[in-house]
Every structure is written in structure tokens, then in C-alpha cells.
Amino acid sequence: MNQEEKLLQEVSAIAHRLKELHNDAVIAYTPQVQELCDKKATQNEVEKMLDWLLMYAGDERMLKLYKQVCRTYWQIYPESIAFYIMEYRKEYDRESLIGTEYEYLLHEDEMDEK
């Protein structure tokens, strides 16, 4: 096996493990999100859940859970939910910021490095 084949095999194994990790996250977080949305959670509880879900929001199933929390608590904690929606957009949907008043957020990382 040459170097290129070995590298391809290693990358494939990492991709497979990442897919398993996302599957595990969906299984673990689905009942937690349901429980959170079925009660009047504190702002801190909602923010912690969204922090965890944001890490996996690139997966459509996790994004669905993320949106469920946002929709459930939008009217109760509007500032927090608006913040987490913007965090999602900055991380996973950067194109949606182009041409908006939030376009400057696309350059935050560059400003932090200076």
C-alpha cells in the first residue's frame, strides 16, 4: 500500500467515525431537546443546549433540533435566540450574511487576528 492509499484509508476512517459521532449525537440529544421544549426552561438551560447543538448543526438532523429549541423559546428569550441564530449563520450559512447589515461579521476572525 502506497502513501496515498494509506492516507485515503485514514481519511475514510475519520469520516466514518465522524458520521457515527453525529448519529450518536442525534440519538443523545433528541430526547433532551424534547424534554427542554416541553417545559419552561431557564435562559441558562436554553443557552447551554444551543451551545451543544451548535457544534453539530452542520448535520441536518441536528439543525432540526437546533431550530426546534429556537422556535420554542424565541418569544421567551428573544435576545439569546437571536444571538444563537446569528452564531449559526456565521458558522454554517455565511452566504446569508452577504448584503445584509451583518456582513461585517464575516470579517470578525480577521479583526481578531490583528
Question: Where in the sequence are the language-model features?
Answer:
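Intrinsically disordered, low-complexity regions
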Residues: 5-8, 30-34, 51, 59, ...
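Amphipathic alpha-helical interaction modules
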Residues: 16-68
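Short, charged, low-complexity amphipathic alpha-helix
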Residues: 1-13
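Amphipathic alpha-helical binding modules
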Residues: 62-114
